[in-house]
Amino acid sequence: MFERFTEKAIKVIMLAQEEARRLGHNFVGTEQILLGLVGEGTGIAAQVLKSMNVNLKDARVEVEKIIGRGSGFVAVEIPFTPRAKRVLELSLEEARQLGHNYIGTEHLLMGLVREGEGVAARVLENLAVDVSSIRAEVIQMLGENAEANVSGSNTTQARSKTPTLEEFGSNLTQMAMEGGLDPVVGRQKEIERVIQILGRRTKNNPVLIGEPGVGKTAIAEGLAQRIANRDVPSILEDKLVITLDVGLLVAGTKYRGEFEERLKRIMDEIKSADNVILVIDEVHTLIGAGAAEGAIDAANLLKPALARGELQCIGATTLEEYRKHIEKDPALERRFQPVVVGEPSVEETIEILFGLRDRYEKHHQLTMSDGALAAAAKYANQYISDRFLPDKAIDLIDEAGSRVRLLNSQLPPAARELDKELRAVLKTKDEAIRAQKYETAEQYRAREMEIKAQIAAIAQSKKNEPDLNLEDPVVTEDDIAEIVAAWTGIPVTKLTKSESEKLMHMEETLHGRIIGQDEAVVAVSRAIRRARVGLKNPNRPIASFIFSGPTGVGKTELTKALASYFFGSEASMIRLDMSEYMERHTVSKLIGSPPGYVGYSEGGYLTEAVRKKPYTVILFDEIEKAHPDIFNLLLQILEDGRLTDAKGRTIDFKNTLLIMTSNIGSKVIEKGGGSLGFELSEDQTESQYTRVRSLVNEELKQYFRPEFLNRLDEIIVFRQLTKDEVREIAELMLNEVFARIKQQDIQLNVTERFKQRLVEEGYNPSYGARPLRRAVMRLLEDSLAEEVLSGKIKAGDSAVVDVTNEGEVTVLLGEKLELLT
C-alpha cells in the first residue's frame, strides 16, 4: 500500500511514529495519525485543519488528556492499531472514489473522518471541529464537484491542467506575481534574444550559456517577471514559466518505465496546456537522466518535441558542461539555440547590487551604504579571481550583512547566563511532567516565567539606553573589506595606527635579522608600503626583484625575514628551490602536468600554492640553476600578474611579492674588488660597489634574455660583508645557540676573546656568513656537546666559553668564573 503514498503522506506516517515515541506509546493509533497530519504543515489535510483552527499544540494537549503518557519503552518498529489500519484502508478507498492513483494527506484525513470512532474523532470533537464538513472542505480544496463525489461518482475535474508538472517544478510566473523573485537588473539584450527565439515556429528553445555566477537563471526569472507585468509581445502573454527539477523527477523511480512515464506525462500536459515555457537549469543533467539498464534517457525522450516546437524550453548551463555534454550530441545541440551570457562589468554589477539592496536590507534588518555596494563590486573584481561577477559581489554584501547583524544582536552577558538557566529549567520541567510530578513541574514553570520576564527586561533596557543608536546598523566599505580579507587573506582594510607604525619602521625590524644590505632592505620595504597603501599597479605583482651577489650574504635570509615579519611566519612563504627544476620536463611541476600524463589532476606546485594563498612572498631560490624554459613561464607573471595552469584556470599573482636569488656575478665580485680583504675608506668602498654592480649587471645580461630582465622592477646586488658586519652576525648566531641551550636549563655566555676568535675564523669575504656558521658549530657547539655528554655541565648550571692563551676553547663552570676576572 505504502508505494502509492505521496511523499507528504509518508512524512505524515513518519511524524505519527515520532508522536508515538514522544508520548512513550508502543503503537500508532488514529490520534497519532491526526497529529502527523497537523504537524506535516504543507499538505491539503494540514491546510483544511488549519482553516478549522486546529493547531499542533492544542491537538497534543487533547491527545495527552485522553490517552495519557506511556511507559517510555518504545520498540524500533511501532505497529499500527486495528483502527489505524482501518483508516489506511479507508484512505485507499477514498482515493479510488476520487479517481486518484495515489494516496495523499487529504485521503488520510477523509479516511480518519470516515472511520469516526477512534481517539482522533474525539480529539476533533473536543476541539469543536465540525467533522461532517471536513470531507466537503477537502473536496472543495481539491477542486472537485462536491455533489458528484458525495454520491460516489468517479468523475473528476482537475483543478490544474498540469498536476504532474506542478509536482516536479516551480511556477516562476506565479512567484513573480507574488513578489517572490529578486529583481533582475539589466540583461535586457539577453532577455530580448530569448523572447525572439521563443517566438520561432520550430526549435524555439534558447539555451543560456555562461560562466557560473553570471546570472543565467536570473534571465529566466527576468522573463517570468516581464510576463507577470505583461511587458512581453502578445505571443508570450499568459504563458507560464515553470522550472523543472530533474533531480526530483528521477528521485523515487524504483521500477523500469516509471521515469519515462513521469516525463511523458509532463510532455503531454505541456502539449495540452499550450501555455507553458519549461525552464531546465543545468540542462546537461538531461543527458543520461533515468537511463538505467538500457532505458531511454530524458534528452532522447525530449528531442522530438523540442524539434517540432511542441515544447518551449529554456536551458541553462556552463560553457564547460555545454562543451562536454551537449556539443557531443549534435542531434540535441541543433534543437537548442545558444544565447551567450557574459560576465557584467563592475559598473553593471554596482547597478545590480543597487537593485538587490532592498531585499538584503530587509533580510538582515539593516542599511547598506552606497559605498559598501560600490566596494563590493570593486573588491570582488580585484581580489577574488576564481569566481565571476555579479555572484561574488552579491555574496560579499550578503556575508557582510550577516556579520554586521550578528555583531549588533548579541545579548548582554547577564541575558546569556539567564538564557542558559532557562534551558536547564525547561529540561527539568519536561522530566517532571514525564514522571507525572505535576507539583514540581508547576514550580519550574513559575521559575521559567520569571526568567523570561528578566530576559525581556534586559532586552528592553538595552533598547532604551540613550547612548545606543536606535537606527538600523549600517554595512560600510570597511565591513566589505573585512569579508574580503577573511576570504582571501589579502589585507584590504584601511590601515590602523599600529599597522602604519609597523610599516614605517619596517627597515629597522628587518635589520634586526639582516646585517647590512641597506639597498635590498629599503627596496623590499618600499614595495610592501606601496602595496599596502594601494598605490601599486593593480595589474602587476607587488614587486619583482633579483637579489644577486656573493654566496652567504643574506639573500634568502632577507626573504625569510620578510615572510616572518609581514606575512606571519616563514612557512607562509612559497619557496621554490630552482635546482630542482634543471631539466626541461620539470616545467610541468610548476603549472601541472598536461592532460594524459601522471599528476594531471593534482595541479602545479606554484599555481596551486598561489590559489590557496594569493597574498604571499614567492622565493625562486638560485634562479640561474633552473632550465631556461622556466624563465619563459615567468614572463607573463612579471608583466601581467597572471599564469594559466594545465587545466586552463587563470591564477592571479597580482598580490604576490616575487623574489629571485642568484649567485651570478659572485666570481666578478670576488675578483672585481681589487684590494678586497683590506680596510677601505668609505669613498673607495662606494666606488668599488658601483663598479661591481655594473659588472654583475653585464653578466646577468649575458645569462638572461633582455625581455626577462626588462620586466623586473629592480636588480639588487648585495654587498660583501665587512668584518664589523660579520661580528654583528656572530652575535645573532650566538644568541640562537644560547636560546637552544637555555631550553635544557643551562645558562651560557661567551667572552670577548672567544667572539674575536670566532670572527677571525669565520670571516671570509668570498663566502659571506656561512664560514662563520661553521666556526660556531666547530668552536662552540662541539665543545658544549662534549661537556654535556661527559656530565661536567648539567641542568641548572651556568657556563662561560673562553679561549686560552694557547688558543684552545675551554668551557668554565659558574664556580670558576672568578678566574676570568
Swiss-Prot record:
Domain of life: Eukaryota
Annotated region (Repeat 2), positions in chain: 80-144
Membrane spanning stretches: none
Record: residues binding ATP: 210-217, 549-556
Keywords from the UniProt entry: ATP-binding, Chaperone, Chloroplast, Nucleotide-binding, Plastid, Repeat
GO biological process: cellular response to heat
GO cellular component labels: chloroplast
Listed name of the protein: ATP-dependent Clp protease ATP-binding subunit ClpA homolog
Gene source species: Pyropia yezoensis (Susabi-nori)
